[in-house]
Amino acid sequence: MKKAIIAMSGGVDSSVAALLTKESGDECIGATMKLYNNEDIGVHREKTCCSLDDVEDARSVAYQMDMPYYVFNFTADFHTEVMDRFVDAYENGCTPNPCIDCNRYLKFDKMFHRMQEIGYDYIVTGHYARVEYDEKRDRYLLKKAVDDTKDQSYVLYMLTQEQLAHVKLPLGGLWKDQVRVIAEKHGFINARKHDSQDICFVPDGDYAKFIEKYTGKKTPEGDFVDKDGNYIGRHKGIIHYTIGQRRGLGIPAASRLYVCEISPKTNTVVLGDNEDLFSSELEADNVNLISVDSLAEPKRVTAKIRYRHKEQPATAWQTPDGILHGKFDEPQRAITKGQAVVMYDGDEVVGGGVINKIYSQS
């Protein structure tokens, strides 16, 4: 009999993952990560991810299954590894994905180490993706979920071989509707609970307001300029903008203007036409490869540049310094620094990294 820690968010997915694991005969405990206090984010919130209501829902489901349940306090780590990185990225003109950092540094690092400390064998999550072992290649593979509308392999690209060997994802072969039916059949309190949509610590979606409250300082205003450096107007501070943004610029113009570039060094935001947003080539650091050891030779892949982006044909390779390069067959709109680029070979995740450079079309 194996021993499993079920990472329970309070949602229906992790609850059904817990049920399926327990029904397999393994010894299970449920655990929810405590990531912050409400006062940390300056709001009273009960209805979004990681809230007190979520803890109570997770506890209810665990007790219903006669499964021990714990809350792991990772608040200090969450501040350092997720919130601080989120703020730093925006202040440096990037648009981060904090869910990936949470997986990288908390769920599959801190909780992974907790699993090892207590002598358990693996972690179970409610992510929609699949982990398989390939005997011929002697490596673990991360694959897309059967339900492509819910596939979350993109946010798991950072998993290492050691981690994949101790991770189980029971929902990878199920459709979301099937998961809800299972939850309803067992009378789970969260069977029809809505999926969380917001960044958990910015529930109102106002990233700039959160950053200014978190840092205790107001971001300095600066200039909007065109791609030739000509002055257009004043902006409210670079943390208010992301690549491709059109609304909220406050600039009267004869044609639509979009945020094309953010320069923290000069505190300027470059505005341009929609066509200025397209580019074909990027570089990424913080690289993790799963299906291969390296990309020393160019490899044909499909690639995503954000979670909701439809994969596009591309060629991927690494330079000797480990930097990941991706060149799309066709120009892509609004490739953004700070977002992850994830490469696929069919349904296998080849690997990915954090975008840190975009090559101009010109």
Task: Give the positions of each predicted feature.
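AMP-forming adenylation/ATP pyrophosphatase catalytic core
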Residues: 124-362
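ATP-dependent adenylation/nucleotidyltransferase module used to activate substrates
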Residues: 1-157, 168, 178
